[in-house]
């Protein structure tokens, strides 16, 4: 109870303003009350993602919290959070992510001093790992990559990080293309796919070839190349059948489709794939992924992004979050290169979100300490 008595009624936070895409600082945000299966986390560090500007810009919800990835300390637990039901306990250092800019749960958002998080939608930070490193791993990227790679609705890859795919006798592991390998999602995808036993070919600028190779990519191609798709198809001996498109633009989709071998295959994009583009090659099965669906909640978004509650996917997500904890504790995955700001706090977060929006960040994960 001593920890509870130190928790204020209101807090500092960033929220959506009445102007779409503009974040507003407040000192009177109510500290959230807990549901029985939630924990209250005092936030220490947050990591930025493209969704931190895309959601407030494209899905304005004035007053809603913003920010997804976080790390911090559990300072209060809900009535159902107890040993035998949940692994987390009071005082644990944890990391994870929430669905921010959420009109159904406007209190959610990690750019704050305190957040309420479901006790099975996070992972415990191992001893010796700094908060800013844990925040940079978070759950946005690793969750979306896991969903895209291994769920039956998407690539449904054979093998897993725990049980790598076994090639046929005398053969080589299958290829997977990660389009956009020098992004935070890209370097995480490369690591997880390599753990699962695959060969990985990726795209980025030549300046980032060494970066993606340091995370395990077998071959990198310049995404500016006019014959990119044909070059990848030739390099993979016309056998590529799995593609993860982090960029998910009309151009990247066409290049990905051109890379897939004659027999066709599976494509998953990290943005909504319009039907008119998805169907340009009949031998390719296309899907797109939204990481927040792993929480199993209703997604109240328009423009084709919304979805009803999905308990099955929520159960899959909870299992993946636990697998993420195991990967972190085993030293199997590491974050994207970190640009850490220890001083600027909420002002720095606002500036960082604007940098992401202007496309000024490359090869770095922006992380801020909450001061």
UniProtKB/Swiss-Prot annotation:
Domain of life per record: Eukaryota
Signal sequence bounds: none
GO molecular function, one term: nucleotide binding
Nucleotide-binding among keywords: yes
EC number: 1.-.-.-
InterPro entries xref list: ADH-like_C, ADH-like_N, GroES-like_sf, NAD(P)-bd_dom_sf, PKS_ER, Trans-enoyl_RdTase-like
Reaction(s) catalysed (UniProt annotation): L-leucine + 8 malonyl-CoA + 4 S-adenosyl-L-methionine + ATP + 9 NADPH + 12 H(+) = (5S)-5-(2-methylpropyl)-3-[(2E,6R,8E,10E,12E)-6,8,10,12-tetramethyltetradeca-2,8,10,12-tetraenoyl]-2,5-dihydro-1H-pyrrol-2-one + AMP + 4 S-adenosyl-L-homocysteine + 8 CO2 + diphosphate + 9 NADP(+) + 8 CoA + 7 H2O
Transmembrane region(s): none
Protein keywords: NADP, Nucleotide-binding, Oxidoreductase
Pathway membership: Mycotoxin biosynthesis
Residues where substrate binds: 140-147, 291-295
Complex formation: Monomer.
Functional description taken from the UniProt entry: Trans-enoyl reductase; part of the gene cluster that mediates the biosynthesis of myceliothermophins, mycotoxins that contain a trans-fused decalin ring system connected to a conjugated 3-pyrrolin-2-one moiety and that have potential anti-tumor properties. The polyketide synthase module (PKS) of the PKS-NRPS mycA is responsible for the synthesis of the octaketide backbone. The downstream nonribosomal peptide synthetase (NRPS) module then amidates the carboxyl end of the octaketide with a leucine.
Family: Belongs to the zinc-containing alcohol dehydrogenase family.
The name this protein goes by in its record: Trans-enoyl reductase mycC
Organism annotation: Thermothelomyces thermophilus (strain ATCC 42464 / BCRC 31852 / DSM 1799)
């Amino acid at each position: 109870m001593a920890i509870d008595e130190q928790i204020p009624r209101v807090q500092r936070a960033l929220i959506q303003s009445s102007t779409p895409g503009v974040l507003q600082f407040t000192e009177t945000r109510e500290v959230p009350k807990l549901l029985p299966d939630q924990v209250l986390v005092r936030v220490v560090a947050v990591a930025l993602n493209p969704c931190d500007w895309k959601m407030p810009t494209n899905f304005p919800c004035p007053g809603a919290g913003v920010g997804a990835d976080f790390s911090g300390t559990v300072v209060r637990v809900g009535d159902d959070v107890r040993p035998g039901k949940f692994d987390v306990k009071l005082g644990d250092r944890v990391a994870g992510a929430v669905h921010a800019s959420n009109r159904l749960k406007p209190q959610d958002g990690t750019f704050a001093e305190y957040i309420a998080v479901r006790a099975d939608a996070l992972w415990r930070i191992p001893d010796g790992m700094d908060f800013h490193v844990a925040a940079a791993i978070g759950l946005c990227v690793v969750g979306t990559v896991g969903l895209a790679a291994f769920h039956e609705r998407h690539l449904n890859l054979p093998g897993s990080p725990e049980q790598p795919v076994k090639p046929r006798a005398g053969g080589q592991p299958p290829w997977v293309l990660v389009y956009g390998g020098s992004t935070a999602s890209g370097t995480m995808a490369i690591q997880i796919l390599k753990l699962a036993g695959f060969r990985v070919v990726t795209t980025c600028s030549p300046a980032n070839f060494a970066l993606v190779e340091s995370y395990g990519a077998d071959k990198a191609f310049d995404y500016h190349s006019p014959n990119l798709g044909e070059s990848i198809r030739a390099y993979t001996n016309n056998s590529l059948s799995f593609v993860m498109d982090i960029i998910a633009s009309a151009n990247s989709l066409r290049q990905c489709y051109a890379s897939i071998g004659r027999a066709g295959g599976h494509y998953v994009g990290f943005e909504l794939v319009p039907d008119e583009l998805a169907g340009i090659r009949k031998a390719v099965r296309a899907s797109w992924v939204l990481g927040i669906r792993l929480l199993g909640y209703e997604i109240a978004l328009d423009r084709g992004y919304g979805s009803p509650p999905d308990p099955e996917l929520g159960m899959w997500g909870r299992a993946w979050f636990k697998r993420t904890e195991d990967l972190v504790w085993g030293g199997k995955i590491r974050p994207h290169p970190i640009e850490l700001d220890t001083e600027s706090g909420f002002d720095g977060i606002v500036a960082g979100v604007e940098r992401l929006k202007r496309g000024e960040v490359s090869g770095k994960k922006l992380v801020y300490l909450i001061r």
